[in-house]
């Protein structure tokens, strides 16, 4: 495999891996800092599309970077939560949804279907507390655009909470649309999802996703994503908090890690698999903690790939995360293979 230098202004990470595989080991820590001078042409970012020296670096492994002249950020205009860049914001002024909830509601055994462009099946606003049980949720649209609005703000996600709490239990979520995340928590949204199967088929369609400071708690999920830039456990600008316990999380698309972290994410007792990407990517001032998790990644051997590590910590200049030290810890579970952590 052709190896290239990872392009970044500053890359700093703290790594803690202990008790991996069948043979337990004492936890170790390491800190790495890399600075590349401006007189060498930047190499592509992990799993990004390559370019010649006249082109901008490729995209990060999950989610497209915003344009540097646009500088999109969470709508409060501040630094956002962990992983939130500074700068101004261009969040949507409204969202489209088939079923929009602004008052407290509980429903059981219903089906929610969305076929419109960049439209959600379920949307939670105005501080509503909504519980959906034993549900079926389908999101299908050939006209959806995906892109930054889907990655940063949740546009077109099957289930989206922007202000209020959403509890999902015992359901099935399927999306076949660009930008069709399974479950998305943004801003003042709080999502709890359990005992649910989530399948996404198109690009920019994470399984469970937080951004803009959202909060999401997941337990015993079966998640499969198939598109590019579609991590099974995904976060983006503005970060947030995600806690995952149990379940299987599989990403099959190119440039789609099992976990893409621009937030504070904790995962316990889960199986994490990326079939065409590094298993874990942590960007900037953010953290990922794994306990008793199996971890598997697989980067195809071709000259477009910068590295073949299972776990990568890096800093891009896209503005998708605040510049700072990435933190990764792994206690128990299976050892990252074949090459560990970069």
Per-range role (PLM):
Residues 1-11:
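Positively charged n-region of N-terminal signal peptides that target proteins for export
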Residues 15-19:
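C-terminal motif of bacterial Sec signal peptides marking the signal peptidase cleavage site
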Residues 23-93, 317-319:
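Disordered, low-complexity segments in secreted/periplasmic proteins that are enriched in proline
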Residues 83-144:
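N-terminal segments that cap or nucleate solenoid repeat domains
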